[in-house]
Design a protein with these regions (language model features):
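N-terminal pre-triad scaffold of radical SAM enzymes
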Residues: 42-48, 62, 309-336, 369, ...
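Helix-enriched interaction subdomains in cytosolic or periplasmic regions
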Residues: 1-15, 112
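Conserved, mostly hydrophobic/aromatic
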Residues: 183, 293, 328, 332, ...
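N-terminal [4Fe-4S]-dependent radical SAM core
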Residues: 9-36, 46, 250-321
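Glycine-rich beta-alpha loop elements in corrinoid/cobalamin-binding modules
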Residues: 46, 54, 73-272, 278-284
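Terminal amphipathic helices with adjacent charged low-complexity linkers/tails
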Residues: 78-79, 207-260, 273-275, 281-285, ...
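Conserved SAM/AdoMet-binding glycine-rich loop
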Residues: 34, 41, 57, 71-72, ...
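Iron-sulfur (Fe-S) cluster-binding segments and ferredoxin-like electron-carrier domains
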Residues: 335-352
Length: 465
């Protein structure tokens, strides 16, 4: 496939071949000369080779570790399961993700009406994934390959790692580990954990070794609980939560509190005769590691298998946007970010951001306008505690509410300087802020930021978070 960027005279977009994407079929695997795969990833989304889509990020990170990786996007679960068989058994493990959204949120409105479209599918068509994707895919893989490890991750698995209220069935459900039969769960952003798992498995599958890694959850027998670190919290059992709403509420508060700590405890939740163990997360990803993740050789395009099948709406929305940071310390009660990305912000370097913008200017169809320079909240770039020792003692869900933390550095000047550097790049006419802005972060010293955004970076209406 060859594409040319016509918006800048003399500037050409990269020419890509099918081999520039991770393989999705046996034909593509054989074209690389591979006779065996190390890891096979299954995703509920279409395969878009872009750093905004989890399967692509994990696949590229594993590829960077020297592993042979393939992705099976949106396999058919209703026929003879040929999509689950076509690539055979991987040498190390299967990885399963529901996609960028929980499959039930993707499928149904708040009134539990079936949606007629799917933003993560070619043509925006619905019906290419089942309800409870992670559980369905994992059960199928365990049925076909009972001896091959299945590792689950992504937003659906992450937010269902312990007992949770399932709005769609109006009931409490146990950990997705119990319902799916998966061997291991990675919660949160997996770009630190997954490569560590791959390294740990180079010498063969050793579940005991994997259970020692941070940011994983697994099912354990009673005798294994006695060997856990002393800094652990025993939650109420799933069975007690079914009988007592107060017990479930207490569990939720404990889990939420630990997710807001810089140094969290191990969580243990009894379910039946086993225990769900949730190890503490890794420290916030470093700038170097975050830059490395964004610098992987993404094509930034949907896989050629979707040519002629219509646009993928989710991709169309973000294809000319740039993510500046990860994490959010807003602490909104309705938001899942603290449970998935955490409240501590990790920012990319200026050069990493500018390098990505340069790549954008060479993409087909780019007309000089960046749709978003943002993140979970638009204006938290390079923000955090001035004194990290104080942050280590803190368990506040929000650094903003009910008032700004006195330890918070809310200086917007680094972000303003980044905006200006982006706008000075050749090929960029204008950059917009499409993410929501937290106006409660403004102080007397940040009025210049609001002026900068309103005058130079608003495409119609200012978006707030």
């Amino acid at each position: 496939m060859t594409v040319h960027d016509t918006h800048t005279p003399g500037r050409k977009a990269p020419a890509y071949k099918p081999a520039d994407w991770l393989p999705t079929s046996l034909k593509e695997v054989r074209a690389r000369g591979w006779d065996e795969l190390d890891v096979i990833l299954f995703s509920g989304d279409a395969y878009i080779d872009h750093p905004s889509f989890g399967a692509a990020v994990i696949g590229r990170l594993l590829e960077a570790e020297g592993l042979r990786v393939a992705i099976v996007p949106q396999p058919n679960w209703k026929d003879d399961l040929r999509d689950f068989r076509k690539l055979g058994r991987p040498r190390l493990f299967f990885g399963v993700s529901g996609g960028a959204m929980d499959s039930m949120v993707n499928h149904y409105t708040a009134n539990k009406r079936l949606r007629s479209d799917d933003a993560y599918t070619a043509g925006g068509k619905a019906g290419f994934r089942p309800d409870y994707v992670v559980t369905v895919y994992t059960r199928i893989l365990k049925q076909l390959y009972p001896d091959t490890p299945v590792i689950i991750g992504g937003i659906e698995a992450s937010l269902r790692r312990t007992t949770h209220y399932d709005y769609w069935s109006d009931s409490l459900k146990p950990s997705v580990l119990v319902e799916s039969g998966a061997d291991l769960l990675i919660y949160g952003m997996g770009d630190k954990t997954m490569p560590e798992i791959a390294r740990a498995m180079r010498g063969g599958y050793n579940l005991n070794l994997l259970r020692k890694l941070p940011q994983v959850a697994y099912l354990a027998a009673r005798k294994q609980i006695e060997t856990l670190p002393e800094n652990r919290i025993m939650l109420h059992s799933f069975e007690r939560c079914l009988k007592d709403k107060k017990a479930f509420g207490e569990n939720f508060v404990r889990i939420e509190t630990e997710s807001n700590r810089m140094q969290a405890a191990t969580l243990v939740e009894p379910v039946g005769d086993r225990f769900v163990v949730v190890n503490p997360p890794y420290p916030s990803i470093s700038e170097t590691d975050l830059d490395r993740s964004f610098a992987l050789p993404y094509t930034r395009l949907p896989h050629p298998r979707y040519n002629g099948k219509g646009d993928i709406p989710a991709y169309e929305m973000i294809k000319f946007s740039v993510n500046l940071h990860r994490g959010c310390f807003g602490g909104c009660s309705f938001c899942t970010i603290s449970a998935h990305q955490g409240k501590f912000v990790s920012s990319r370097s200026e050069e990493s951001v500018l390098d990505e913008v340069r790549k954008l200017t060479r993409m087909p169809g780019f007309k000089g306008y960046i749709s978003d320079l943002g993140g979970p909240s638009a204006n938290m770039y390079r923000m955090g505690g001035r004194n990290e020792a104080l942050c280590r003692k803190c368990s506040r869900p929000s650094c903003i509410y009910p008032s700004l933390c006195r330890n918070l550095n809310n200086d917007h000047r680094p972000l303003m300087e980044l905006y200006r550097k982006v706008d000075r790049l050749a090929g960029v006419k204008k950059s917009f802020i499409g993410s929501g802005i937290r106006y409660d972060l403004f102080g007397d010293n940040n009025r210049d930021y609001l002026r900068e955004v309103v005058v130079n970076h608003v495409s119609g209406r200012l978006k707030v978070a």
